[in-house]
Structure formats: C-alpha cells, structure tokens
C-alpha cells in the first residue's frame, strides 16, 4: 500500500456525471441486500434520485458534497456528505466507499480522516452515518463512531462527536 497522503477532490455539479456510474456500481455490489425492495433499488439508481442530489449540490446552505479520494495518481474511492449547519454542524455521510482493490489495507481509515478534516474545515461539528452490514458497523466503530438508534426509515444510525 502506498504511503502517499489522501487527496480529496470536490466534484462540482457540472462534474458529477463521472460520479454516478461509480455510485450505481457501489449500490448494486455493496449496498443492496434482501431487505431492499425493488422500488428502493430502482429509486436509488434512477434519474429522479440523481436529479434530487444534483439540486441539493446547488443549495446555498446544507449543500451535498461529492468527493473522489485519491492516493498518489490513483482514484481509490468516493463519498457524498452534507453538513447541516441548522442542526449544530451535523455532517451526514450519505455514501462512503473504496474500490475493491484498495479495501482492507488501511486506506478506508485514511480516507475517512481526510474527509473528517475537510468537513470540519467547512463547519462540521459532529458526524452521522447509516450502516448496512456487520463489516461496515465494525469499520465505523473503529473510527470512533457509536450506535445512535435508528433514523426515520428504521435504518441503524451511528454518531461521532
């Protein structure tokens, strides 16, 4: 594994076209399971969802951020997050993933620390994320997140800070 630092590339709304195919692959390969309905799967892979997120990227407040993680010259993963200043600086990590060749080597931790610092620089005071697998739960706990009940959809929620 390279010791190069993680670089975060913020994607603008105009640049997000390259994000969506990667996001859809991530959802299909890593996120969807037997608890997700066909309607859920269709929505999160739809132009409707994409349009809603892209509109949220243009909001003046509580704007969605799409980022690419780079180590050296390699694009190793992606994330989406939003900082809610009207909720005490809550940073909701909507999506966070590394491409399979870069997993289980410490790069996920490095990417999270880079994302946390970037979000704190933008006003984040605390962090929240949903998880959908035991492995994801262990990963987020290893970064200092603690269980925080469920969200409005009944999905398990974790919090840090």
Language model feature labels by segment:
Residues 108, 112, 133-136, 153-158:
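Short glycine/proline-centered loop/turn elements that form peptide/ligand docking sites
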Residues 128-130, 141, 146-160:
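Conserved catalytic-core motifs of GNAT/GCN5-like acyltransferases
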Residues 119-132:
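Conserved GNAT acetyl-CoA-binding A-motif
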Residues 98, 104-117, 142:
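Conserved acetyl-CoA-binding loop-helix of GNAT-fold acetyltransferases
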Residues 10-89, 94, 99, 118, ...:
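Acetyl-CoA-dependent GNAT
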Residues 6, 62-64, 145-146:
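Short glycine-aromatic motifs
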């Amino acid at each position: 594994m390279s010791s190069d630092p993680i670089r975060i590339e913020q994607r603008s709304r105009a640049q997000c076209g390259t994000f969506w195919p990667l996001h859809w692959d991530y959802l299909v390969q890593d996120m969807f399971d037997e608890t997700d309905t066909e309607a859920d799967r269709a929505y999160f892979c739809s132009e409707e969802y994409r349009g809603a997120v892209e509109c949220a990227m243009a909001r003046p407040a509580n704007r969605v951020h799409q980022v690419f993680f780079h180590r050296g010259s390699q694009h190793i993963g992606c994330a989406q997050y939003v900082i809610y200043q009207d909720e005490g600086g809550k940073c909701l990590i909507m999506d966070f993933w590394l491409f399979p060749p870069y997993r289980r080597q410490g790069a996920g931790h490095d990417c999270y620390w880079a994302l946390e610092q970037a979000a704190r620089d933008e006003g984040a005071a605390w962090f929240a994320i949903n998880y959908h697998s035991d492995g994801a739960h262990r990963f987020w706990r290893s970064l200092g997140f603690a269980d925080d009940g469920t969200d409005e959809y009944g999905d398990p929620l974790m919090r840090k800070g």
